[in-house]
């Protein structure tokens, strides 16, 4: 498989959580996602609605036919403790990006927290497989990304777009995600086979914690596309306002 294809898979893996939440906070964020969505309505430019609906339906089929079965099997054969360690490892690798975005947003406290977390978890936490920064020191990770940074500099959402596999986004967040990828060390793994293995491992591991979230969001709604779109925009607005 070519490195360009591997990069696409890696991007999908890294963005899978980003569409709804950063990896380590995925479960808690989803609960907040639902609560916040119920409280207020949101507006978003959606000039690509026809194409977006096609992509949404495609992603729906990919999820139920490929992603969910793989994640279920992975969950069955991998102990929860191992999956948590894997999640910690990948989350720790993304710390430099969160640190940079804290700096760019002028959030000194957040930058200091991310720096300390990375140093502690990379050493005491054995390359990030453990999270003593949270468990022993009470240093909770931030959730900053380049999309939020662009928003603080006055960039609006732009139009809504649903990417194949990657899922819901906006013009601003799409640009932001591309930048976030460049700060992740996994992108710079030279061997394509190792790169692809890490990408698929991250994706399967993350989805193993999120089984049922998508189904819950779709439940009892006549138009899941609109629900997903509005919930995503409101969730991102909430993140930016923090």
Regions found by a protein language model. Give the residues of each.
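Bacterial N-terminal signal peptides
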Residues: 6-17
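N-terminal targeting leaders of membrane proteins
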Residues: 20-108, 136, 187, 196-242
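Solvent-exposed loop/turn segments at secondary-structure junctions
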Residues: 61, 129, 167-170, 234
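Alpha-helical transmembrane segments of helical membrane proteins, especially in multi-pass transport
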Residues: 163-176, 181-184
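C-terminal transmembrane beta-barrel domains of outer membrane proteins
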Residues: 192-193
């Amino acid at each position: 498989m070519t490195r360009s294809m591997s990069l696409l898979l890696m991007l999908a893996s890294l963005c899978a959580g980003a569409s709804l939440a950063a990896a380590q906070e995925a479960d808690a964020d989803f609960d907040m996602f639902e609560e916040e969505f119920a409280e207020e309505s949101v507006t978003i430019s959606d000039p690509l609605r026809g194409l977006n609906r096609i992509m949404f339906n495609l992603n729906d089929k990919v999820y139920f036919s490929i992603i969910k079965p793989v994640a279920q099997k992975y969950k069955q054969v991998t102990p929860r403790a191992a999956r948590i360690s894997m999640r910690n490892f990948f989350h720790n690798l993304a710390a430099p990006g969160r640190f940079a975005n804290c700096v760019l947003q002028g959030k000194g406290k957040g930058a200091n927290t991310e720096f300390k977390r990375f140093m502690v978890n990379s050493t005491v936490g054995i390359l990030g497989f453990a999270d003593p920064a949270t468990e022993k020191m009470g240093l909770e990770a931030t959730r900053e990304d380049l999309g939020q940074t662009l928003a603080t500099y006055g960039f609006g959402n732009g139009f809504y777009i649903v990417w194949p596999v990657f899922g819901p986004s906006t013009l601003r967040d799409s640009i932001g995600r591309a930048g976030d990828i460049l700060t992740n060390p996994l992108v710079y793994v030279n061997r394509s086979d190792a790169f692809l293995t890490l990408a698929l491992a991250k994706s399967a591991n993350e989805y193993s914690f999120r089984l049922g979230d998508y189904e819950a969001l779709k439940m009892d709604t006549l138009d899941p596309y609109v629900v997903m779109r509005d919930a995503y925009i409101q969730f991102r607005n909430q993140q930016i306002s923090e």
